[in-house]
Amino acid sequence: DFILAVGGGSVIDSAKAIGYGVANGGDVWDFYSHKRNAAGCLPIGVILTISATGSEMSDSSVITNEDGWIKTGYHSEYCRPKFAIMNPELTMTLPDYQTACGCTDILMHTMERYFTKGENMELTDSIAEALMRTVIENTKILKENPKDYNARAEVMWAGSLSHNGLT
């Protein structure tokens, strides 16, 4: 048994929360409010349809409790997806606005780390700079040609790398 998340970050993160609930029982919000730690997670698989959050490769999830509108995250190696199908063709029907939002999300995740102080960050900063350049260059290409496979592939890969411990 496993959960197949078909979509972007919100869908994937919801699948992770469901996986915690199935594997552990009780109230899922106990994990997200840090009242208890998960002892497992139903395996997650992903078919990515928008490049943005990097959730397809991460051990983190962020969900919103609509009762009080509390947005909070939880991370555990248990919920890192077992596989992610990342086919840029699945993003080609996205409206330009959603593509731009995804590219902006990738940039923000990368800049968040880039502008955080730290020692001995030369390599990490160089990776972040390369990711930002890649996203900016390919966002321009996608504005002119939304069906450009290579630009979508570059953005998809950058999104997965930008929020998964490299930067």
How would you name each of these model-derived features?
Residues 3-6, 45, 162-163:
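Short glycine-rich or small-residue beta-strand-to-loop segments that form or flank ligand, phosphate
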Residues 11, 52, 163:
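Surface-exposed, flexible loop/turn segments at secondary-structure boundaries
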Residues 23-120:
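A glycine/threonine-rich phosphate-anchoring loop and its flanking beta-alpha core
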